[in-house]
C-alpha cells in the first residue's frame, strides 16, 4: 500500500494540475467512488472528508441542506446514548447543540439497542422538528441494531433522514445493503476499516456514501467517466468543500490498493473474519469475566465486545482500597505488562474493557491474547494490590497529563 502511495505519478503531481494531466489520480478517485457504492449499496459517494468525525459533519450538513432546500426548519437530531462520542460533538458543531437546535438522547434497552418505546416518545414529542437520527451500527457494544430498518421507516415517515455511523463497518462490509436498510448517509473510516494505520494522531481519512436524495448536495467534486476521460463535476446544489483539493489523496491510493487486493469476495471475508474473531474471543473469556451491557450476555456479538469484572472481583479490589471506577483503567495498564496494547477502557460502559480483535490476527495470536487476559484476572484475584502500581514493565509508569498539557514543548533540539 505504501509502495503504491509513493509512486512518482501520484506524489509528483500538483493537486491543481490540469485535468488532462491528472487522469491517473482521477481514475483512482472514481474507482473508490464505485467501490464504495458497491460496498454500501448507496448510489452517491464523496471522497473528500479527512476523518470519520468530519464525515459525520458532512452527513449532518447534507441533512440541513436537504431540509433547507425543501423550505423546512428542522432543529432536532436524535442520538442514542450508546453512540460514538463524536456523534454528539458533531451534532453540536453542526448547530444542533446550541440555541438554534437540540440534541435529543435515545435510551437503550437491556441489550444495548435503541429502546423503541423511547424513540416513539421522542417522535411524538418533536414530530416534524426532527431533522434525522444518528445511529452507530453495529453499536459500540458490538451488537447489531436489529430494528434499524423499522427505526428508519419511522424517521422517514416524518420527513427526517437517517445517518449511520459506519466506524464499525468492518463487521458488515459487503454483507448488508445500507440503501435497503434505510440509510441516507454513512461514513467509512479509511484509517480503520480500510487499511490506513489507526491511531498515533492521524492523519485519518474517510468517505461518505449517501442515498439518491442527497447526491445533489455532496461536497467537493464527483468524478465522472464518459468512456474516455475522467472529469471532476461539482454537484448542482453542493454544500461546498470541507478540505482543499482531494482530501488525503495518498490514503485514497492505499485504500484502493487494499480493495484491489481483497476483491469483492475478499471484502466479505474480511468482515466475516472480524466477526468470527470477536465471537471466538468472547466465547473464550465470557466465563471468567462479566459481559456488558448487563443482561446482554446471550446476544451474539459482531466485531467487538465489552468485558468487566464480576461482583466478587470488584469486592476484592475494594478490600485493598481500589475503587470500582479506577479498576478498568488499571486493568488496561496490566495489558501493557503482558505485551498487548491497552484496550479502550471505561467507555461506553464506565466499568468496561472493550475488546476488538479485528480481522488481522491468527487463531494462535487470539489464543495467546485470551491466555493473557485470563492470567490478568488470576493476578488480580491473587494479588489485587498489583493493580495499584501497574504498569510494571514499561519505561514510563504514568504519563503526567497535567504537566504535558501545561508545559508544551513545540520544538526539540536535535543536538542533545
Locations of regions flagged by a protein language model:
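Non-catalytic terminal extensions of PLP-dependent enzymes
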Residues: 1-44, 49, 58-61, 116, ...
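Aromatic side chains
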Residues: 66, 105, 144, 163, ...
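PLP-dependent aminotransferase class I/II
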Residues: 243-254
Amino acid at each position: 500500500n505504501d509502495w503504491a502511495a509513493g509512486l512518482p505519478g501520484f506524489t509528483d503531481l500538483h493537486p491543481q494540475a490540469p485535468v488532462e494531466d491528472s487522469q491517473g489520480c482521477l481514475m483512482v478517485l472514481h474507482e473508490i467512488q464505485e467501490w464504495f457504492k458497491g460496498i454500501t449499496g448507496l448510489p452517491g459517494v464523496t471522497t473528500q472528508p479527512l476523518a470519520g468525525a468530519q464525515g459525520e459533519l458532512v452527513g449532518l450538513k447534507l441533512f440541513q441542506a436537504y431540509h433547507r432546500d425543501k423550505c423546512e426548519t428542522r432543529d432536532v437530531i436524535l442520538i442514542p446514548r450508546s453512540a460514538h462520542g463524536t456523534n454528539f460533538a458533531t451534532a453540536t458543531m453542526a448547530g444542533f447543540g446550541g440555541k438554534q437546535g437540540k440534541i435529543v438522547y435515545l435510551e437503550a434497552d437491556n441489550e444495548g439497542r435503541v429502546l423503541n418505546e423511547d424513540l416513539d416518545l421522542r417522535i411524538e414529542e418533536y414530530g416534524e422538528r426532527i431533522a434525522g437520527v444518528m445511529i452507530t451500527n453495529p453499536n459500540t457494544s458490538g451488537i447489531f441494531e436489529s430494528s434499524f430498518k423499522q427505526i428508519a421507516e419511522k424517521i422517514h415517515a416524518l420527513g427526517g433522514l437517517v445517518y449511520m455511523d459506519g466506524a464499525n463497518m468492518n463487521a458488515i462490509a459487503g454483507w448488508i445493503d445500507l440503501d435497503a436498510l434505510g440509510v441516507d448517509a454513512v461514513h467509512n473510516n479509511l484509517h480503520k476499516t480500510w487499511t490506513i494505520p489507526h491511531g498515533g494522531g492521524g492523519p485519518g481519512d474517510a468517505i461518505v456514501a449517501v442515498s439518491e436524495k442527497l447526491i445533489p448536495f455532496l461536497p467537493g467534486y464527483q468524478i465522472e467517466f464518459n468512456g474516455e476521460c475522467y472529469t471532476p463535476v461539482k454537484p448542482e446544489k453542493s454544500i461546498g468543500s470541507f478540505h482543499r483539493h482531494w482530501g488525503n489523496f495518498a490514503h485514497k491510493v492505499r485504500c484502493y490498493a487494499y480493495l484491489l487486493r481483497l476483491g469483492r469476495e475478499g471484502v466479505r471475508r474480511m468482515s466475516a473474519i472480524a466477526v468470527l474473531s470477536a465471537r471466538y474471543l468472547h466465547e473464550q473469556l465470557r466465563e471468567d469475566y462479566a459481559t456488558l451491557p448487563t443482561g446482554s450476555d446471550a446476544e451474539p456479538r459482531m466485531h467487538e465486545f465489552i468485558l468487566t469484572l464480576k461482583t466478587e472481583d470488584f469486592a476484592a479490589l475494594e478490600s485493598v482500597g481500589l475503587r470500582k471506577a479506577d479498576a478498568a483503567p488499571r486493568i488496561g495498564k496490566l495489558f501493557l505488562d503482558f505485551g498487548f496494547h491497552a484496550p479502550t477502557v471505561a467507555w461506553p460502559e464506565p466499568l468496561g474493557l472493550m475488546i476488538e480483535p479485528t480481522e488481522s490476527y491468527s487463531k494462535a495470536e487470539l489464543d495467546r491474547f485470551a491466555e493473557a487476559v485470563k492470567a490478568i484476572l488470576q493476578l488480580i484475584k491473587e494479588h489485587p494490590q498489583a493493580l495499584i502500581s501497574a504498569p510494571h514493565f514499561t519505561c514510563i509508569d504514568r504519563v503526567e497529563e497535567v504537566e504535558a498539557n501545561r508545559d508544551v514543548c513545540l520544538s526539540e533540539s536535535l543536538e542533545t
